[in-house]
Amino acid sequence: MKRVTLLLVATMLAAVTATAQDWAKARLEKSPRHLEWVKVKHGDRVVNCFIAYPEVKDKAAAVIVIHEIFGLTDWVRGVADQLAEAGYIAIAPDLLSGSAPGGGGTAELGGADAVRKAISSLPPDQITADLNAVAEYVAKLPAGNGKLAVGGFCWGGGQTFRFATNNKNIKAAFAFYGTGPENEADLARINCPVYGFYGGNDNRVNATIPTSTELMKKAKKTYEPVTYEGAGHGFMRAGEDPAGNEANKKARDEAWKRWKDLLKKI
C-alpha cells in the first residue's frame, strides 16, 4: 500500500510539473515568428542556442537571453519569442550544453536538482567564452544591425551583470533579480548601462543592491535598479503563469514595459 501511495504522489507531482510548463509551450507552438535551434561553435565547445526572429522590414538589434538556474526551459525560449514579437532578434544559449551524458544539455540532465548541480559546476571562463561566441554569432547575422543587449534571470541575472564586465560591445545589460560583481577592477570594465529588476520580497538578492549601487557609482558607471513591491524572486516567470499571484503579474507587466522602453534606446 505504501508503494502504491508513493507512486501516486510521484505521478501527481509529475502531472503538476507538466501542467506548469503547458502555458509556456503553448506560446511557442502558437508563435507566428521564425524560431530555430542553432549550434554556436568555438574551440572544442558546441553551444546549443534557441533563436527567435522578429517580423520586421529593417535590420534589428539582438538580445542575448541568459537562462535561470533551471537551465534553458520553455519559459526562457518564450521570453526570446516575446522579444522577437517586440522587434528584436533574441538568442537564448543553453550554457549547460555538453554537461549531460552524451554531450547533451538542460533537457538531458534529468531534473531540476541535476540542472542546479551542473550550473554550479560551470567554469566562469567557459561561461564568458560561450557568451562571447554567441555575441559574435549574432553580430554576423545578415538580419542584424550590429547592436547587442543582454538580459538574464536569477542565475542568469548575475551572469548578465558579469558579462557586462567582459564584453565591450554590449549596449545595455538587463539584470533580473541577479546579484552583481563585487570586484572593482571588473566593474571598471563595464561599457554600458546596467538596469536592474527586483522583486520586493526577495531579500537574499535585494540585500546586495546597496553594494552594487555604491560600487557602480564609485566606478562612474550607470546602474539603475527598480524594485517591484509585493513581487517575489522569479516574478517574470511566476507573473506569466496563469496561476500566479497578482503582485507577480503586475510586476511582470511593469518590468516588461520598462524593458521594452529601454531597448528602444540602444
Residue ranges with predicted function:
Residues L28, W37-K140, R237-D241:
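Serine-hydrolase catalytic machinery in alpha/beta-hydrolase-like enzymes
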Residues P142-F153:
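Alpha/beta-hydrolase fold nucleophile elbow
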Residues N169-T179:
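A conserved short beta-strand
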Residues N201-N206:
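Acidic catalytic loop of the alpha/beta-hydrolase fold
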Residues K217, T222-I266:
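C-terminal catalytic histidine-bearing segment of alpha/beta-hydrolase fold enzymes
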Residues I190, G196-Y198:
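Short beta-strand/loop motif that positions the catalytic acidic residue
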Residues V4, M12-V40, V47-F50, W155:
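An N-terminal hydrophobic leader/cap segment in hydrolases
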Residues G152-G156, T160:
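Gly/Ala-rich beta-loop-alpha elbow adjacent to hydrolase catalytic centers
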